[in-house]
Amino acid sequence: MRIANKFLVPKESENQRIDQFCLKILPLIKRSDFFKYLRLGKVLLNKTKPQVNTRLKTKDEIAFLFDINPYLQTNNDYLSLDLVKDKLKIIFEDENIIVVDKPTGIVCQPDKKHSIINLSNMLLKHCGYRQFDSNKLNFYPQFAHRIDRNTSGIVIGAKTNKALKELNKVFKNNHLTKRYKGLVFGQFNHLGLQTAYWKKDNNNGIVTVKWKPFPEAKKISTFFENSSYIAQKDMSLITIRLISGRTHQIRACLNLFSNQLVGDKKYSLIQFKNRNNKYKHQALHAYELVFPKLETSKFPILTNYSLMQFKSKIVPWFEYLIQ
């Protein structure tokens, strides 16, 4: 059962039939398909199989035991946040910023496939929003950056407009220290600063990384701090400090060394195909974030967080793999 597929019944849906409520949540599903899932026990009400004519009560829990993303509405301009049940895993929070741990399998921002369950909507719900209309709000709490859906770890957000502007400036200039843990196939022997050239294909979302400059490519820098080889698994646990912050930078860069992240399907290498297929997520975890020393004149809000260090409280799945 996936957490992302659970919903709480809001007060305004009290006494509604379960099929009517579910068909509103999943507007793109065929009625026949929904009733098939209901019949097969893939729709649960408070952890039990309901009858089709069951009437709902406030705070009833509905769980879908199938992938609901193809059936969700893609227009996210207006959203009832009562449908968002998941809670943030908070590392730090005050009146200006919030630092959270993102689990694997959840996207940071809404997209066509994840219009309801995403980290952004969880933040809005946490901050007391019951409804969200992006056309009517000048500012709303939001995250200043994102990590991949199948990467876990630290994400930082802003709760005020001033804090967001300063965070955006800090990220734009790569001032924050961002460290990751990763698990790669084979022995990794490329410690230290590595520079390469990066380009993203916006049509398919794939990035290309090469050692030498090529047309429209941008220079990237990655510092590989530590590597521990686990001989019985033929894998290496590595620590990475991200200097520039380009899309899929770590994942694509590792291919240059004929290594790849365990579980990475997008940037997989043929020699690891058979071993790689058994893993659902890529073995990458954002485990530490450190603020630099910030000047009060330039960062009147964030100066209070100068040199603050935040560490993830999640133990990534791949560390259990090598124990």
UniProtKB/Swiss-Prot annotation:
Answer whether the UniProt record assigns the keyword Protein biosynthesis to this protein. no
Q: Which Pfam families match?
A: PseudoU_synth_2
Q: Which class of enzymes does this protein belong to?
A: isomerase
Protein name in the entry = Uncharacterized RNA pseudouridine synthase MG370
- Annotated S4 RNA-binding domain ranges read 16-95
Q: Which GO terms describe its biological process?
A: enzyme-directed rRNA pseudouridine synthesis
InterPro entries cross-referenced by the UniProt entry: PsdUridine_synth_cat_dom_sf, PsdUridine_synth_RluA-like_CS, PsdUridine_synth_RluC/D, PsdUridine_synth_RsuA/RluA, RluA_PseudoU_synthase, S4_RNA-bd_sf
Q: Which organism is it from?
A: Mycoplasma genitalium (strain ATCC 33530 / DSM 19775 / NCTC 10195 / G37) (Mycoplasmoides genitalium)
